Amino acid sequence: MSLRATAAAAVLLALAAAVPVHADTQEPVLDGETGLFLTVSGGDESWIRGVRLRCSPRPSGPHPDAEGACAALDAAHGNPDRLVTDPHPCTKRFDPVTARAVGEWRGLRMDWRKTYPNVCVLDTATGPLFRF
């Protein structure tokens, strides 16, 4: 193997080790990290917005509806895929957005991400959690 190929393999290995693994189960948070960092980004990554949400010991943070967002997560037992939906009509316009929740909820680590066809579909699927 050439020196260039060896160096490239070493860089890829280092990057793979640095990228967090997305676990299907939640695990306890052992460090001082608290709350969730919620983001919504455009499908082409031309824009992103984010906000911190803390649910323990009480809803707080700059999220505009921290109480509603925490209540929605509590009802879903911390699983954004199980949020109670807020159905309302949406256009079929394809303008994808990706929602992400990273951090901790009630002491459990979370790294969740999902792409929706547009902002309206995101809103119907996630209710107050990503309304910021």
Show the residue positions of the predicted features.
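N- and C-terminal low-complexity/disordered segments
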Residues: M1-T98, V102, L108-F132
